[in-house]
Amino acid sequence: MAPTTLTALAGEKTLQSSFVRDEDERPKVAYNDFSNEIPVISLTKESMKLAAVVDEICRKIVEACEDWGIFQVVNHGVDSNLISEMTRLAREFFALPPEENVRFDMSGGKKGGFIVSSHLQGEAVQDWREIVTYFSYPLRTRDYSRWPDKPEGWRSVTQEYSEKLMGLACKLLEVLSEAMDLDKDALTNACVDMDQKVVVNFYPQCPQPDLTLGLKRHTDPGTITLLLQDQVGGLQATRDGGKTWITVQPVEGAFVVNLGDHGHYLSNGRFKNADHQAVVNSNHSRLSIATFQNPAPEATVYPLKIREGEKAVLEGPITFAEMYRRKMSKDLELARLKKLAKEQQLQDVEKAKLESKPIDQILA
């Protein structure tokens, strides 16, 4: 069972066993060993009016998406003061007394609120993070009873932040459509009525960061994710199935754009779905804000363009709801098998210990 908060655990010298990952899942690269392999792309209004500049932006995005499924954007039009306010309020929320946070506990199937780890039900290992999440689009999905009422100003700022991020997402979908050689409205139309979920991640200092992860390796299910991260570092990406990892260089005020599974399928596999994780450290807490832009549940998932000589990556069209269900079912089954394997390993260790004991000690 997940602890109420990680505040108390952060001060301990050793990590609780529920957070300890198998050796093959542990971090291979330090949180601050930064790489500049992920391109940073400027989206100024002036540059987006120039055909030659747009062509160059599309070229960089194609290269980044074919390679990593990740790029960063600056000069994106989201006001720096709004970003600062959102970040400040998020840090203040996680600094509140635990009893304030758990008023919005989202366990038990509640939509939105506060939770520790947020690992899949049945998983053997927890993530070292606390989150607060809320659903913001379509507007009918907003349940303000699940939006924290502290610190003061939280709701008004998060509403404005959600609105601006939706605008940025629409702009990026147009650019991605052009990068795929499609009409600029192609991806937006494929989403039907875009969903938006905002997840604020807080990663406290960790006593043994080399043994755990802030967020396990995964791909996002949706179209794109816009991630705002502080300057501490911890977002990592792989392009070779987890053999090697890089730590993404934080850029002040930038948004990291991760392509999700939906975007991957719409491109017929040409663009990667970003394979990523978050690591933690013992020196600094870390904050990131992930805005997930997903298609409507009834949206069709199928390649928008199949180039000559290619085969479709999907056997046939499915809804996003069905795609998501299959992904969750697969993740739950993998978690179940991993948990069983771990339990069997512990049983084998205990059995070996027992078999090595003299008979008089066993019967004592």
UniProtKB/Swiss-Prot annotation:
Keywords: Dioxygenase, Flavonoid biosynthesis, Iron, Metal-binding, Oxidoreductase, Vitamin C. Fe cation binds at residues 218, 220, 276. It catalyses: a (2S)-flavan-4-one + 2-oxoglutarate + O2 = a (2R,3R)-dihydroflavonol + succinate + CO2. GO terms for molecular function: flavanone 3-dioxygenase activity; L-ascorbic acid binding; metal ion binding. It comes from the Eukaryota. Residues 191-295 form the Fe2OG dioxygenase domain. Pathway: Secondary metabolite biosynthesis; flavonoid biosynthesis. Gene3D superfamilies: B-lactam Antibiotic, Isopenicillin N Synthase, Chain. 2-oxoglutarate binds at residue 286. Catalyzes the 3-beta-hydroxylation of 2S-flavanones to 2R,3R-dihydroflavonols which are intermediates in the biosynthesis of flavonols, anthocyanidins, catechins and proanthocyanidins in plants. Belongs to the iron/ascorbate-dependent oxidoreductase family. This is Naringenin,2-oxoglutarate 3-dioxygenase. It comes from Vitis vinifera.
